[in-house]
Structures are given as C-alpha cells and as structure tokens.
C-alpha cells in the first residue's frame, strides 16, 4: 500500500530538490513506515560527480541528515559513498536471548539512540560487460556482535527442545521468529 504524502518538487538538467511530508495525519506514537515525517532532498550534478543531500524530521525518530556522492571516474570505474547521522532509529531487539522457548515473538520494536550509517564502494565494468561491485559499510542500527552471538546460540539450542516432549509447532514457531533478526 502507498503512503499519504504532500510533495513539492523541482528539477532541471543538473539539479533537483524535493520537499515531502509523509503520513501527515498520523499520531506521534507511530513507528516505521507509519511515522509522520518531513523530509527534504537535493541533488546536484557537477561534471562526473552526482551529489545528494537530505534532511528528515520524524515525529518519533527525530532528526536525520545525510549526504552521498557518486563519481564516474572512467568508462569502467564508478566510486560512491554515503553517510547518514540520526537522532533516533527504529530497530528490533530480542527479549529472549537464552535457551527457553517463547510464547510470543521475542523480537520487539525498540527505539535506538543517536548513530550513523556509512557506506563506501565502487564498481568496475569491463569491456566484456562483466561487472564487479565492492562495498564496505557500517550501520549502528544493525545488531551488535554480542547480539548475533546470542542469536546463533539460540538457533543451536532451539532444536534440542524436540527431544523434551515439546510440541514441534512451538519449536518451529521459535525458530521462525529468529528470522525477524
């Protein structure tokens, strides 16, 4: 389904900007795609470089700003990078990191504090039209190494419940919920 929004846009051959108010009638408590937010985006082409910038103010997540650039260095090579800093972000966290079975989905929505997302990458396309893309990224909204270790340990122990006369559907449900990570 779509999202209700109001939008103003301008563009020409080298520049574009947008101002968007998404979910203008939604209450402040809404999260994720239902959050009311005001966002601005700008694009500028300068020779072989595309520059992007944005700012967003969400009712629930607060302020977010970012910038990106893409440079077509040659006919075969393109380099790109982006950075985003945010006041808050919606994410998920497990309320059950142990070996016990859950009676409901342990992966619950949570609001994170300030953080950032960074991406650096490039692509190469040879004359034979075979391409290679390489990217490195950092994302503060991602689960931590400790949370992934808990997730792995929980996945390993959940099948052992099948030998304890636990209904297979309960074990299957818990394993399926692990997919929410």
Predicted regions and their residues:
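C-terminal structural cap/anchor segments
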Residues: 127-181
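Signature for the C-terminal beta-barrel architecture of outer-membrane proteins
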Residues: 2-138, 143-147
